[in-house]
Amino acid sequence: MENFRIAKFLMQERQGIMIMKFYGRETERKKLNSMFCTDGQMISLIYGRRRIGKSELIRQVLKETELKSIYYECKQTTEQNNVDSLSELVGETFDFPKPAFADMESLLRFLFRTSEKEPLILVLDEYPYLRENVKGLDSVLQSVIDEYRDRSNMKLIICGSYVDTMKELLAKQNPLYGRIDLTLNLKPMDYYESALFYPDFSDEDKVRIYSVFGGIPYYNRLIDGKKSVRENIIDLIASPGARLENEVSMYLSSEISKITNANEVFEALAKGFSRYKDILDQSHVSSGPALVDVLDKLIRMDVVDKITPINDENNRKKSGYFISDNLSLFYYKYIFRNSSRMNIMDSDIFYDRYIAEDFETKYVPKVFEDVCRQYLIRRNRKGLMDEIFEKIGKYYYDDPVAKKNGEFDIVTQDDKGIFSMKQNSAKNL
């Protein structure tokens, strides 16, 4: 019998209640399907920032397999409440009355024991919620995994959005260390996968949309193909009460305790300050160590990147920090500092006055550099470059005669040590 929740999802889809086409993630899907086809017990860890599409990926691969599966979304409630909820799914999956279990350990042992007879996929989505409410859950899992390792056919997927918490499961001191067979850290999609969500736009407009909404599937599903780029931006983020108006601040608040420092850092980065000293001066963060903590956290959250020049990778003075999440970049560049104005102005007038010109002449061309980099990486992976490169990045140079310095936006280096200059020349799209 198919898992009840997955079967219900498929039935709704056929009836037109829920039709969501799945895009991209080919590599991740192949790895998970390969795991399902592997004999014996397999444990997988899937993590990544919220809205990145973890649950959607899992649901998709569950639809693609014939194995019996249980998908459970852990709750922020007591252990017994979670046990009761998961027990209901167990009864539905195996077509018998809801079983009674004293605790999560006894339930897990039952499922692992059952998988001795036939393969079973168990998904524990939002695992950190369960971990908070089941004392020593990592140790419990470790004990069950070890006990049944040589005789179960369990395919366990542990999934979560709190990146730091999920990474703890991979640490040497964690009971689950060495027991994870497959780790998937889901990153934002690149331009080429993201553009699949809005196929009816021109290539130029696809770049414009990507420059705002980036590679987060949840955001891209909100794009209305019947509206213009401008209308989508206004409706989704650049107007009072817009669907994504508070998305960035809510995400940061859920991950960072001192949101004021994060706001200060983001504002400095959005203004173009990328060097550590400049960010410290502009952001008014209380101290150097405090700034380091904020930057490190933002990097772990996949919203900021630290970039060093390809020709001087160990020179800390030439390292730069940049906002890598497009929605965060757009928000802090145009919305955050102007939110009071936006709330009392006509949305079209606000867009024309504070967004339109800079967006076309500076913002989009800058993001286009990243699209070009992604293009080169894709061609390189497919072996289509004349010279297969091993590194790609920025190239900084000093001109002692002219007494100035500069940079090439995109540079590649092959195994011969030859640099290939790929400088972006787009000014307007």
Task: Report residues per predicted region.
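Active-site beta-strand-loop-beta-strand hairpin of nuclease catalytic cores
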Residues: 412-421
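Hydrophobic positions on the alpha1 helix immediately C-terminal to the Walker A/P-loop
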Residues: 57
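Conserved lysine of the Walker
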Residues: 54
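Short glycine-rich substrate-engagement loop in P-loop NTPases that contacts/grips substrate
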Residues: 87-115
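Accessory nucleic acid-recognition modules appended to NTPase machines
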Residues: 225, 230-410
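Conserved NTP-binding/hydrolysis module of P-loop NTPases
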Residues: 66-70, 75-98
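Interdomain motor-coupling "hinge/lid" segment immediately C-terminal to the ATP-binding subdomain
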Residues: 166-262, 266-270
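Sensor-1/coupling segment of RecA-like P-loop NTPase cores
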Residues: 47, 129-133, 137, 143-173
